[in-house]
UniProtKB/Swiss-Prot annotation:
UniProt keyword annotation of Methyltransferase present: no
GO cellular component: cytosolic small ribosomal subunit
GO terms under biological process: translation
GO MF annotations in UniProt: small ribosomal subunit rRNA binding; structural constituent of ribosome
Keywords assigned: Ribonucleoprotein, Ribosomal protein, RNA-binding, rRNA-binding
UniProt source species: Rickettsia typhi (strain ATCC VR-144 / Wilmington)
UniProt-listed NCBIfam families: S18
Official protein name in the record: Small ribosomal subunit protein bS18
């Protein structure tokens, strides 16, 4: 009896939460690397690559950087090559 009572409470809470939420859709900005005069993605350009790496040294996902899928793949490959050639560190040290 307690299980059904708890289950009905959670079901009503979920419905109430959905009705109370307001959904806002924001228009995504375009890819910053697909615009005219955008910098070329190259493993020899660590200043560009460091913008797409987190403070801990991890590659940032495209949903955060707003980079299109094609450029994201090129970025990931360039970052990996730059790490192997010691142009970028694998892990950033905490200061």
């Amino acid at each position: 009896m307690l299980k059904s009572n708890n289950a009905s409470k959670t079901a009503t809470c979920k419905v109430g939460d959905k009705a109370a939420k307001k959904v806002f859709f924001r228009r995504r900005k375009g890819c910053p690397l697909s615009v005219p005069n955008a910098p070329v993605i190259d493993y020899k350009n660590p200043e560009l690559l460091i913008k797409f790496v987190s403070e801990g040294g991890r590659m940032l996902p495209s949903r955060i950087t707003n980079v299109c899928a094609k450029k994201q793949r090129k970025l990931n490959n360039a970052i990996k090559i730059a790490r192997i050639l010691a142009l970028l560190p694998f892990v950033f040290q905490a200061k």
